[in-house]
Amino acid sequence: MAPADVPASLPLGLCLLLASGFGHAGKLLVVPMDGSHWFTMQMVVEKLLPKGHEVVVVVPEVSWQLGKPLNFTVKTYSVSHTQEDLNREFKFFIDSQWKTQQESGVLPLLTSPAQGFFELLFSHCRSLFKDKKLVEYLKQSSFDAVFLDPFDVCGLTVAKYFSLPSVVFSRGIFCHYLEEGSQCPSPPSYVPRPILKLTDTMTFKERVWNLLSYMGEHAFCPSFFKTATDIASEVLQTPVTMTDLFSPVSVWLLRTDFTLELPRPVMPNVIHIGGINCHQRKPVSKEFEAYVNASGEHGIVVFSLGSMVSEIPEKKAMEIAEALGRIPQTLLWRYTGTRPSNLAKNTILVKWLPQNDLLGHPKARAFITHSGSHGIYEGICNGVPMVMMPLFGDQMDNAKRMETRGAGVTLNVLEMTADDLENALKTVINNKSYKENIMRLSSLHKDRPIEPLDLAVFWVEYVMRHKGAPHLRPAAHDLTWYQYHSLDVIGFLLAIVLTVVFIVYKSCAYGCRKCFGGKGRVKKSHKSKTH
């Protein structure tokens, strides 16, 4: 028992402090994805550094965010394209989204202008393995694990090439590779396929469409990832599929949770860390505090379409500006395009804004978002109702989830008018049910035993300490498709049943012939004798 003048928590805290000092300091290889994907992945990496781990991040020389000064070792490799090529391909993809709204389902995405952008990303892996000096360095470094974003596939190839346990960090994976790689059951009867904008209560027609989409993914996704698998096969010197690359993953860290996601079965090595990006809110700067204070009793509306979309076609920008000018709130709009000529006095354009910090301010009334997972979770964490303008990818599903839960209104950004946006904003601001619903979601999301960032760090360290997590790997990985569905067992049992039925039938037929066939012949012979 602790002395009276010593706080009761001190001995426990001292023990934990001493125990942490004897923790395993490992060596982690990180293969990240550029853009907003890197923002939250970097949080995990930086949280690992004070624990004594050595972190090496491998990045291409050409990137948007990865080339910025970092607090850990960075190894770069040259690529065959320039920054202008990367910007051009991405701009081409983004511009196409402002011309035609992406149709529901993965298949339209596979045939969209995104193909050229992905081909550029996939080519990074060939460039990495052409750098023999870098490959030799990685080989000699004796890493404990690979921490990777699977979006460009290269991290999976790196893990397999060096035979290292891997931790995937992702929002999700379009196509069926998440289910096949993790072996999480995904019955199309109630688990909607990505980007279909469906819920788990589907009509018969929706279930038909969901199943067809599932079958279509198996037919067309391999061709979309052909460049990536060709490069992986070339590097590994053996033919591989996407499933071959995903199957060895030790732990899956998914940036979602069941506050947003629909309930579904998961495996023990699938860990949900939704809201990892909004764990810590800071006071807003003096500049933004001045904007907020000047808003008066009406408060502010935060408007951002994400870090990768900061310009909008002029006509659409003017429609948006007109709608924003009709509401009494102060609008803080992250926008770097041409200033709309009709911009109202209540709308302030900024090149960057502290989104999470502003949403956490008591005067935040609404959030206009493109429905990316980072923004959606910041809205949930801070309890701010949303007006959602999804453009592509998982944004469609995110918006549908929030709208279904009564926490926001979804608009078709290409077809909406100034009146539509005005009405949507007034609805989520003035209708109390939206605020109540988002606060309920916020309460559910925050009611957890451990912060998502700490949970992510724990599992990365876990894989490093134990050199993987094979005990969490389901045996389904080792079964063929017909064994997984017990078709061989069903066939065997069916064969037994049919054999028994056949034997019984033949026995009965034989018995009948013996019993009745013989009597018939006797009677017949008897009649012939009398004649």
Swiss-Prot record:
GO BP annotations listed: coumarin catabolic process; estrogen catabolic process; liver development; response to 3-methylcholanthrene; response to Aroclor 1254
Protein's UniProt keywords contain Lipoprotein: no
Signal peptide segment: 1-25
Enzymatic reactions: glucuronate acceptor + UDP-alpha-D-glucuronate = acceptor beta-D-glucuronoside + UDP + H(+); 17alpha-estradiol + UDP-alpha-D-glucuronate = 17alpha-estradiol 3-O-(beta-D-glucuronate) + UDP + H(+); prunetin + UDP-alpha-D-glucuronate = prunetin-5-O-beta-D-glucuronide + UDP; 5-epi-5-F2t-IsoP + UDP-alpha-D-glucuronate = 5-epi-5-F2t-IsoP-glucuronide + UDP + H(+)
GO molecular function: enzyme binding; glucuronosyltransferase activity
GO cellular component: endoplasmic reticulum; endoplasmic reticulum membrane
Ranges that cross the membrane: 487-503
Membrane topology listed for this record: Single-pass membrane protein
Name this protein carries in UniProt: UDP-glucuronosyltransferase 1A7
Entry's localization field: Endoplasmic reticulum membrane
Known role: UDP-glucuronosyltransferase (UGT) that catalyzes phase II biotransformation reactions in which lipophilic substrates are conjugated with glucuronic acid to increase the metabolite's water solubility, thereby facilitating excretion into either the urine or bile. Essential for the elimination and detoxification of drugs, xenobiotics and endogenous compounds. Catalyzes the glucuronidation of endogenous estrogen hormone epiestradiol. Involved in the glucuronidation of F2-isoprostane (5-epi-5-F2t-IsoP). Involved in the glucuronidation of the phytochemical ferulic acid at the carboxylic acid group.
Keyword Transmembrane helix among UniProt keywords: yes
PANTHER family the UniProt entry points to: EG:EG0003.4 PROTEIN-RELATED, UDP GLUCURONOSYLTRANSFERASE FAMILY 1 MEMBER A1
Positions glycosylated per UniProt: 71, 293, 431
